[in-house]
Amino acid sequence: MNLFVDGAVVAGSTSCTFTLSANTADAASKTDLGDGMWDNPEFQNYGWQMGNESFVANVAGLQTLLQKVINGNAEVDVHFQVGDDVSMSGRAIITQLQVSAPNGEKATLSLSLEGCTPLSGNAGQMDVAKAKISPIKGKAMMLAMQVSNTYHTFAASTSHSLTVSVQTAETTTKDDNDMGTYKEVTGKSISLNTENLVSVKNSPSQVTGITFAEMLAKVMAGETLKLAFGYYGSSIGAEAGDDADWNAAETVLVSGDFVCTNLSANGANKENATYSAEFSGKGMPSVGETEN
């Protein structure tokens, strides 16, 4: 079972899903057996969804997907096949793209797709290229904040994530004779998340990145924050508390203005104090560059 996006199988795929949903209308009437108390669904048309989980192995490919979702109409050509028996193709909207980058694990990419045209069956089999991939470590993908015109990473980070969501609406009309449904994009949103150990700057000269105290002050002041999420590669600091140089990032994935919508801290006995912050984007973000 494999999912292809724009003619290529999703690299590093670990799981893919396909769902076909029938849209029905209740045709129950008083003259039915049982005096019309039993549902009598009649098929109207169908909708379909696909999903894929994979390791992040190609930063350039990830950036291309982000450009399609953020700068474009989020539509892609998809092909789904199961062995030699099932082969379906169609046009779909990426309704959610999520990148998770936890420390000590591989970075992962999750895609949710919603069909925006009817499916075409018997589309022919596509070759699945077999190749060994090198998944990117979660540690190599970081979130940074602009402070005094310079981007700084968050101190003692343990995980970061990026989520782009797309809202759709059905546009199927009486003129459409197909059994499937048509959809279009009506809205988009982006969010970022960081999870960290609570760290303290013991002296003004100590370099530890953005701390919980600094975040708390910014949230209470209602500041709009400039954030950037990207791939550092081997340039990331060896210690979790290092304040890595954002300019050394090999690839900036997204950047823009954000507001912190949730800041929470947890101080359990016998465990490290931790905090997490969630950010919602203000307007359209940039792909591949930082905003000053």
Stretch-by-stretch model annotation:
Residues 53, 280-282:
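RNase H-like, metal-dependent nuclease domains and their acidic two-metal-ion catalytic environment used
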Residues 57-95, 206-253:
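Short, acidic/charged, Gly/Pro-enriched secondary-structure junctions
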Residues 59-62, 119-121, 200-204, 235-237, ...:
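Residue-level signal for secondary-structure boundary sites
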Residues 64-65, 121-130, 205-209, 288-292:
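Short, charged, solvent-exposed linker or helix-capping segments at domain edges/interfaces
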Residues 155, 186, 235-236, 279:
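Generic alpha-helical secondary structure signal
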